[in-house]
Amino acid sequence: MEGNGCGGSGATPRGVVGMHWAPVVTSPPSPQPPFLPPAPCRPDVQMQQQGGLTCLKLGKRPCFWGGDGAGQVAQGSGGGGGGGGGGSADQGKRKEKAATAVPVVPRCQVEGCDITLQGVKEYHRRHKVCEVHAKAPRVVVHGTEQRFCQQCSRFHVLAEFDDAKKSCRRRLAGHNERRRRSNASEAMARGSAHPHGMPVLGHGFPPYGLPTSSAGALSLLSSARATGPWLMPTPDISARSSAALDELIAENRAALLSWQFFSDRQPPPAGRPTGRSPGSETAGGWHAHLQARPPPPGAGGQHEHQSGHVTLDLMQATTAAGGSGAPFRPVPARPAKEGGDAGCTSDAWTPSPMEGARVV
């Protein structure tokens, strides 16, 4: 046991390795400074340091704090001030240029026209065309013959105009379309505002079949319900109707007299009864007397027997009829006979023996 121990003075037995522990040589430790407690700092300096760490420099005024950052911030602010000074210098140069710039005087854009548009109307000055060339049928602008359009207020080529029109074809078509729409709307408005609900057709003209003049009030078939704006006023209807009635009676009498005049010239066949009253024979003799009278001088062939034309003085017939006071007397129509004209009423109206008309 003693030989196996680490200590002992005996020899090391065979087969056993001996281990010797040698001491490690190390450098002596360096002297460390003595630990000093931190110096007490003032609260204002500490707040400035914290503010410098959290400042994002987003405002116009830079953040100032103590230490090394203060110099950097001061340098940065100085550089910014230099930039601001450069901007103000540029603005000053711009103002000087604007003050020294010469105002451009507008001129007519037609080639060969150097008229300044300084004392003309604002319209010509704005569109850069003088008054003479604005109305000219053709001018040369940019090497092409053009014309100034009064509605577009600019130049067009001559192919866009119709004949000597001052406005282009496209603008004229739009203008005409707007006029047609306005006229149609006005006509519809007038028709809806009519007291009898009767629309006005054809751009203000009366409907087809009605007279277009004031003589429409003379119609005997017109009534107060059918009166429109184209007819006569109400106070004159009675007087006009009376005049129209007299005129119609005169025309009827003239037609009957002319028919009797030609029937007397061609006597009926032998054996055919005339069926006329004695008064009609008197009228026939009166017509024969008129035929025997020579035509007035200067009458020409119009009043000859060969011409077959008769001119009646309707006013004379109307006056004579009104003065005699003997109206026409209706006579029953003749019955239809074999070989004769069915429904022929030659004696439907027989004039009075005392009534007459002047045949010229």
Swiss-Prot record:
Organism expressing this protein natively: Oryza sativa subsp. indica
Highest taxon, organism lineage: Eukaryota
GO cellular-component term (any): nucleus
UniProt binding sites for Zn(2+) 1: C108, C113, C130, H133
Biased composition (Basic residues): 172-182
Subcellular location: Nucleus
Gene name of the encoded protein: SPL7
Signal peptide: none
Known tissue expression: Expressed in young panicles.
Family annotation (Pfam families): SBP (PF03110)
A molecular function GO annotation: DNA binding
PROSITE patterns for this protein: ZF_SBP (PS51141)
Annotated S-S bridges: none
UniProt keyword annotation of Zinc present: yes
Xref: InterPro entries: SBP-like (IPR044817), SBP_dom (IPR004333), SBP_sf (IPR036893)
Region (Disordered): 74-98, 172-196, 261-306, 320-360
Keyword Coiled coil: no
Protein name in the entry: Squamosa promoter-binding-like protein 7
Motif (Bipartite nuclear localization signal): 165-181
Function (record text): Trans-acting factor that binds specifically to the consensus nucleotide sequence 5'-TNCGTACAA-3'. May be involved in panicle development.
PANTHER family reported for this sequence: SQUAMOSA PROMOTER-BINDING-LIKE PROTEIN 4, SQUAMOSA PROMOTER-BINDING-LIKE PROTEIN 7
Keywords in alphabetical order: DNA-binding, Metal-binding, Nucleus, Transcription, Transcription regulation, Zinc, Zinc-finger
Span of zinc fingers (SBP-type): 105-182
Domain remark from Swiss-Prot or TrEMBL: The SBP-type zinc finger is required for the binding to DNA.
